[in-house]
Amino acid sequence: MLQRLNCLLMQAGIVITDTQKTQLVQLVELLHKWNKAYNLTSVRDPDAMLVKHILDSLVVSPHLHGERFIDVGTGPGLPGLPLAIINPDKQFVLLDSLGKRINFIRQVIQVLGLTNVTPVKSRVEEYQPDVGFDCVLSRAFASLEDMLSWCHHLPSEQGSFLALKGQYPEQELAQLPANIRLVACHELRVPELEGERHLLEFKHIQPE
């Protein structure tokens, strides 16, 4: 699997350490093992997990600005865990309301020795951080309108929202609230993944 990961990383132009590569392989092995009992993802094949979960998360990394991030509706830690593995200098809170997902993330943290990940079991609208985050991450979580509404209290004053989407969500963007601005849209290329991937960045419009 390590050889396969190396090939995908090369295609994506992503350079990481050997230790980080080993940790990513361990993550896939743990996800594959837990998935048999706890049904954490519909992707069953470890090889497909490398593309659809690991690489699909890693391509977001160049667009992470700041030090403190929250991954809302993280599921089994995606994209939070892969991003935390290759960004050990950044802090990640992984939020989900399902206990089995948070238990899996805790196991990954323990096995991989991650010190920059904090799992939190909570509904996003009920979670109240002491300090706002530099960025709120979302992948396959909800519609843009719901995500921005439920997470409005999470970023700092200068913080942003990053939403990972498939096709460009023209219809969803037309329904954005007036106090939210789309500041960037990045087309992402994920090796061997069919279909479009877009990363949309939003910010609150500060009242003058």
From Swiss-Prot:
It is found in: Cytoplasm. It is an enzyme of class 2 (transferase). InterPro entries: rRNA_ssu_MeTfrase_G (IPR003682), SAM-dependent_MTases_sf (IPR029063). It catalyses: guanosine(527) in 16S rRNA + S-adenosyl-L-methionine = N(7)-methylguanosine(527) in 16S rRNA + S-adenosyl-L-homocysteine. Gene3D superfamilies: Vaccinia Virus protein VP39. Pfam families: GidB. S-adenosyl-L-methionine binds at residues 73, 78, 124-125, 139. Its EC number is 2.1.1.170. Keywords: Cytoplasm, Methyltransferase, rRNA processing, S-adenosyl-L-methionine, Transferase. GO terms for molecular function: rRNA (guanine-N7-)-methyltransferase activity. GO terms for cellular component: cytosol. The keyword Cytoplasm applies. The keyword S-adenosyl-L-methionine applies. Belongs to the methyltransferase superfamily. RNA methyltransferase RsmG family. Specifically methylates the N7 position of guanine in position 527 of 16S rRNA. This is Ribosomal RNA small subunit methyltransferase G.
